[in-house]
Amino acid sequence: MSDPQAALRASWKAVVSDLLAQSEQPNSDVPNFSHSQRLNLQLVEPIMIGDGYALIAAPHENAKTVIETELGEYITRALSQHMGRPCSLAVTIAAPPQPAPQEEPPAPAPQRPIQTEAPEHGMGHQTQAFQQPTQSTQPAPASQPETPNHHQPRSWEAAHSPASLDELAQHYSEQQSTAPSGYPEATGARIPREEPAHNPNREKSLNPKHTFENFVIGSSNRFANGAAVAVAENPARAYNPLFIWGGSGLGKTHLLHAAGNYAQVLHPGLRVKYVSSEEFTNDYINSLRDDRQESFKRRYRNLDILMVDDIQFLEGKESTQEEFFHTFNALHQANKQIILSSDRPPKQLTTLEDRLRTRFEGGLITDIQPPDLETRIAILMKKASADGTDVDRSVLELIASRFESSIRELEGALIRVSAYSSLVNEPISLEMAEIALHDLAPDSADRQITAAAIIEVTADYFNIDVDTLRGSGKKRAVAHARQLAMYLCRELTELSLPKIGDQFGGKDHTTVIYADRKIRKEMTENRNTYDEIQALTQRVKNHNQR
């Protein structure tokens, strides 16, 4: 009788081998994987392959992110080819070796975040707003899933599909984390369709890099920052809901992640979920398609803190608004915290249902404005320090004086200067910054740059049809041009990630993130990519002045 685990590993090895081979072929639909991508792919372990789904385990969180955002599409396609039917993919994190249990010292009281502020009127660091009482007001965490039975035999192909891939990954994660000592590998059980909702606290929806400690405070965002801290310290007791609005690229998303991360430090076990409105909408649509409405409700209503980014994108989606209305009510009535962000205040979300807008207005509404000069310089100093880049203050002042409306635009300018410095292998100077920013410097006389203009210019530059550039073709030349256009949309427009994805045939926001990161990296390593960005930027600006 054959070993099912050996057969599983052999099948997975064949999938990986095929993928790596395809990535090396010149005319393949699979891109040429980088060294780190190949390494992460080879470190993945198969956990379960079922009827149209697969669960794999990455060795750590960074590898999981790479697999999901950069390689997931190609892995899914290869698995589907090997299985002879469409396949969905779920990724979890392999459990580390369990140390022997030992008595833990009592945890110290959590400290308030130490935050960076822009100097104001020569007074240096300011006292943070919203000082809250120190007594514990932790809300009762929502009910946890039942402990799995680790003594049942592992089933490598379940009798039926799990209620959702998220629940499949979560079920495995809980098996690993709760396995008793003496069991080096948790044995699995088949997953019943009506399993309790998975633990959002473990789904890693929060970006650990976004914290209050690295959020630069100035007069334009101090109140919003203080409100977010207060909500993290006292969920559902300070301000509920908290509604943060402001233009794209000003730090709203950073504050939402920071609040979630800080709340989990203060209140271990708190169930926190961050989603964009696009993700909420897609989850809801998929639950209708797959007849998983109850699973969807458990996932979003069995929480202590729900954060929804860019809530304005619910406009025009009547059925999704209806579901979010009921989700909002369920959480609010259960005394659970809700944090929302938008590019406009509630009153200006005119196509949202009145009952939603009135609920948004029932808590605290605070805005974030474009940062002042000193705050912009402080942001650039923080960014340069985080990237390990040595930049003279005069260069930072030059950049800060030219880019006023968006933090994303500000940091993009610094990235372009740093990339040019790496390419020419010279230290950053004022003269170099002037050269690097020549085509990027904003012109107040320019009309607003649109994604359509960027796509049209990029298609013409590479002699590609516009529909092809917007489409899903995987040829390297087309994929590279599309990634350049996505990067420029991110840098030159105020569009959010979901809106940029919409301009490219409805691509997911993670595809835009991948393109942005890939081109940023290539700009520091490949002169051709840097020159392409410079040339395209100039053409877009010329096109915009017609």
Curated annotation (Swiss-Prot):
Annotated stretches, region: Domain III, AAA+ region: 205-421
Region (Disordered): 96-209
GO BP terms: DNA replication initiation; regulation of DNA replication
Sites where the protein binds ATP: 249, 251-253
Predominant subcellular localization, coarse grouping: cytoplasm
Top-rank taxon, per record: Bacteria
Entry keywords, A to Z: ATP-binding, Cytoplasm, DNA replication, DNA-binding, Lipid-binding, Nucleotide-binding
Start and end residues of each stretch annotated as Domain IV, binds dsDNA: 422-546
Composition bias, Pro residues: 96-111
Region Domain II: start-end pairs: 85-204
GO terms, molecular function: ATP binding; ATP hydrolysis activity; DNA replication origin binding; lipid binding
Domain I, interacts with DnaA modulators: region residues: 1-85
Pfam families associated with the record: Bac_DnaA, Bac_DnaA_C
Composition-biased stretches (Low complexity): 126-145
GO cellular component: cytoplasm; plasma membrane
Protein's cellular compartments: Cytoplasm
UniProt xrefs under PROSITE patterns: DNAA
Ranges annotated as biased composition (Basic and acidic residues): 191-209
Free-text note on domains in this protein's UniProt record: Domain I is involved in oligomerization and binding regulators, domain II is flexibile and of varying length in different bacteria, domain III forms the AAA+ region, while domain IV binds dsDNA.
Complex formation: Oligomerizes as a right-handed, spiral filament on DNA at oriC.
Family statement drawn from the similarity comment of this UniProt entry: Belongs to the DnaA family.
Role according to the record: Plays an essential role in the initiation and regulation of chromosomal replication. ATP-DnaA binds to the origin of replication (oriC) to initiate formation of the DNA replication initiation complex once per cell cycle. Binds the DnaA box (a 9 base pair repeat at the origin) and separates the double-stranded (ds)DNA. Forms a right-handed helical filament on oriC DNA; dsDNA binds to the exterior of the filament while single-stranded (ss)DNA is stabiized in the filament's interior.
Protein name: Chromosomal replication initiator protein DnaA
